[in-house]
Each structure stands twice: as structure tokens, then as C-alpha cells.
Amino acid sequence: MRRLLFLFWLLCGVTLPLSVLRPETTSASKLLTLVALLGLCTIPLKLAAPHRRALFLLLASFALVLITLQLPARAPDATALRDAYLTELRTYDTATYVWGGENHRGIDCSGLVRRGLVDATANEAMRRRDPGLARRALELWWFDASAQALGEGYRGWTHEVTRAKDFLSLDPALLRQGDLAVTQDGLHVLAYLGDSTWIQADPVPMRVHVDRVTAKGWFTAPITLMRWRLLE
């Protein structure tokens, strides 16, 4: 029994970093990540088992974390979250484009705009000790969403602001930092950084880059301007 338990822990220890570092993610890989993480959490439980007081404190700590995550959300600070989102998006500049990727080792267009918000929301949840934001970060991480899905308001995360025949036709008065521009064919999405500047994980040069609006490339495509409800 001890040998099987040790092998299980070893498997979890190998699986967790591999699943985290792998650029591409699927529902199966995310489930595997959670299983490996929970498996590693059983190590301190096993070590504390012979000591009742230590075991009680450990179980109480786990219970406290679970209870805390169920507490009501605090009033959101959309400005702080938007600033954090823009900061996270910029950390991906020059990252390699990988279809289905969701981290700095490789990322695609929808992965970029979603993962930036996952990271920003998780960081703000810890900074503000907000269980509501923690739950939202987990939701954003768990449920994948393509560019097309984001343009259709998937799970109520986004809503439409306006439509335009291309980026140059967008009314600047309608733009807010953090807004998303989804091409109307649903193939691509970019995020607005401000000052006529957008960030995108571009499948053409196969990298993430920041550009000002020009009359070429994706900037000539018909678009739907979407806004994250979290940032309002």
C-alpha cells in the first residue's frame, strides 16, 4: 500500500509541472492538473495522520480555505482590475503563437485575452482578499472560449458595444482599455491597450505583438467591439 501511495505521489509530482508548463490546454489537461494538485495535497495529510493535533489543524486549514471561497464577493474595483489586466496582457508581448496555448510558453489569440484576465483576476483576488474574484478567476481558467465565442457573449462574460467595417472606422469615444475586437468571421480577437494601440497573438508572424492601428492586416477586417463585464 505504501509503495502504491508513493508511486501515486510521484506521478502527481511529475504530472503537475508538465501540465502547467505545456502551452496547449484542454478540459482533460485541466482536470489532470486539478487531480495532480489534490493528490499532492494528500502528502501533508499522510504525514500528519499519526499526530492528531497536527492532523486537526491541517484539516481545519483546508476547511477554512473552502469556506472562504464560498463567502460573498466584495464590491468590484473595475479600474484596478482593468489596470491589472493591461499589465498582464503586456507581459505576453513577443510570446510565441501556439494554437490552443494559454501561457507564456505559447498562446493563441483567444488564450491571450482570456489568460490575461485570469491572471489579473487571480492577482486582484489575493490582493483584495476577495473570494468572488477568486471564483471568477477559476471560472475563466476552466472554461475555454474561442474568439467566436467571446464575440457571442459566451457565459455572459462579454457584451457587444458596436460594430465597424474596420478598425479605422471605430468611434474612439466608444473605446475603453481592455475592450476586445472580434473579427466578424470569428477567427481572431485583439485587445485594446489604449492610445490606438492593440495587442494580439497573431498566427501570421506566429507571435504576440503590439501595434498601432494601420490600414493593413487584421486592422482591415470587419469587427465587433466587445467589452468584459468584469471591467465595467
Segment roles from a protein language model:
Residues F56-R155:
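N-terminal capping segments
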Residues R2-I43:
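Membrane-embedded alpha-helical segments of integral membrane proteins
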Residues P222-E232:
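Short, low-complexity, Pro/Ser/Thr/Gly-rich segments in the mature regions of secreted, periplasmic
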Residues S27, A49-P50, E160:
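Short alpha-helical segments used as structural interaction elements across diverse proteins
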Residues R74-A78, R127-R207:
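...with weaker cross-activation on analogous glycine-rich loops/strands in unrelated enzymes
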Residues L32-F62:
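Cytosolic-side transmembrane helix boundary signature
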Residues R3, I43-R52, R74-L81, T91-T94, ...:
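Generic structural signal for short, solvent-exposed loop/turn connectors between secondary structure elements
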